[in-house]
Amino acid sequence: MSRRNTAKKTKRADKFDPIYQNRLVNMVLNRIIKHGKKSLAYRILYRAMKQIQQKTEKNPLLVLRKAIKEVTPRLIVKSRRKSGSTYQVPFEIKPNRGKILAIRWLLKASRKRLGPNMESKLSYELIDATKGKGKAIRKKEEIHKMAEANRAFADYL
């Protein structure tokens, strides 16, 4: 490969969803997709947003943002081997990585939740997350507790 004429990277255009025109909604949408069924993912997300609007009488986009903000972790723990022992070392994470984890935890908690369909389960989980309840919030608190307990190993980066 020639080093003189290296190709310049083009900035990827951020994709937005057609209704809310929001990147965060698109991030959630892409993680709902299973087996390439994007139209089903759109239907699930938009119906969940409509249910949030009906239940809370607030802007569903604000509820989604607040839920993700509440669930976003600041620290995670990673396993590191040092002299034959494995330590759980706490790491600070970048905001984008935190959002991705928060979305993943919210969707996982929604899927495990009892309910008639995914739309209602997702809407209830998002509403609970804004109130500071739910399995996704519990997961974040669990991760933060583990990071706090292993703070002594923070030097083993």
Curated annotation (Swiss-Prot):
Keyword Transcription regulation tagged: no
GO biological process: translation
Cell compartment(s), UniProt: Plastid, Chloroplast
S-S pairs: none
A single GO molecular function term of this UniProt record: rRNA binding
UniProt keyword Translocase, yes or no: no
Any Pfam family: Ribosomal_S7
Main location: plastid
Gene Ontology terms: cellular component: chloroplast; small ribosomal subunit
UniProt entry keywords in alphabetical sequence: Chloroplast, Plastid, Ribonucleoprotein, Ribosomal protein, RNA-binding, rRNA-binding
HAMAP family: Ribosomal_uS7_B
Record's subunit section: Part of the 30S ribosomal subunit.
Family affiliation: Belongs to the universal ribosomal protein uS7 family.
PANTHER family: RIBOSOMAL PROTEIN S7
Protein task: One of the primary rRNA binding proteins, it binds directly to 16S rRNA where it nucleates assembly of the head domain of the 30S subunit.
Designated name of the protein: Small ribosomal subunit protein uS7cz/uS7cy
Organism from which the protein derives: Gnetum parvifolium
Name of the gene encoding the protein in the UniProt record: rps7-A
